[in-house]
């Protein structure tokens, strides 16, 4: 695992700067916590609080948009002050503080407020964390660096979901609906790894040497960016309008008859395929280019969403969750590496903020549309809509965005 000394004087881990590995550990611990506490929010809203599907879409979309807006400004701020780590620490700390309050939630409004706090933290930390990773690797290592980080992040999700499945089994067995007692146990256990993630970040991640100062202080605007980056953001927005909150795939699994513990185990399958795909996809993108892999991932997404629309039995959903993980593994880390390819080093924080901002802002209308289609048409309708926009995005990235 450890190899020759890096330029910072610390031994490399998996052939990369140690920052990448320890940021992966931070994300792993955070995802253990997040998957235990927040993944089952749609079931908590519907099964425990009796909320409508449109409310689920509102909570999912609004929380992601909060994350998005903050990413724009935190990315810009990290470029302006040339400090990534303090913003990352602040963001992870806010999310950790918000999580225990889910134990006290008694209405969808309180859930929305707590999710706002959690996403506030994520919005602050994510661009700085991504910029720290990009600053810690060479251009030739970028895909591998982001791929390793995504693989570790997703490994945390698998561990969190596996632990959640054990708790669900011990508390409520194979019940079709989530109980309040079960959810409260998930919160109590899930807070612990969140605290540990902040400790690791403070102790083991080091600020990299800042990039050379720009002639002008960075501004939050697109004018200074390459046309390729602007077109990529447009195509991402089109795709994301059909990529509603993952709350809906969870609700669809339950809608087709899957019990709570089966839903959690399906999510384990999703995250396993995600983790197994992320690093190879990153390495492949370093060799073959990133645009084609993103397009291929969107094609898989379209097929999976068509599958969710057409599915009629719970066993079919297991296969769809596996395919959904392949899509995530192919696209998430590769798209972030592609952003770094398209922008100068001194604007990376701002670029990541804009990228995450465009994606997150599109998630609010995407989730509201999905909730409305579910209630007004049928549970399959949001997935037909998502598949159509994925095909459109695939055509857009191949036809408009150059490597």
How would you name each of these model-derived features?
Residues 69-106, 285-291:
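Conserved MFS/SLC helix-loop-helix module at the cytosolic interface between two early adjacent transmembrane helices
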Residues 43-48, 159-181, 365-381:
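Transmembrane alpha-helix termini and helix-breaking/packing motifs in multi-pass membrane transporters
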Residues 58-76, 268-281:
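Central cavity-lining transmembrane alpha-helices of secondary-active solute carriers
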Residues 114-155, 338:
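Cytoplasmic helix-loop-helix junction between adjacent transmembrane helices
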Residues 169, 191-211, 393-401:
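C-terminal membrane-cytosol helix-exit motif in multi-pass small-molecule transporters
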Residues 2-17, 206-235:
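Juxtamembrane intracellular "pre-TM" segments in multi-pass secondary transporters
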Residues 9-68, 229-266:
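Helix-loop boundary and gating motifs at the non-cytosolic
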Residues 86-100, 191, 292-307, 387:
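Structural signature of the two symmetry-related core transmembrane helices
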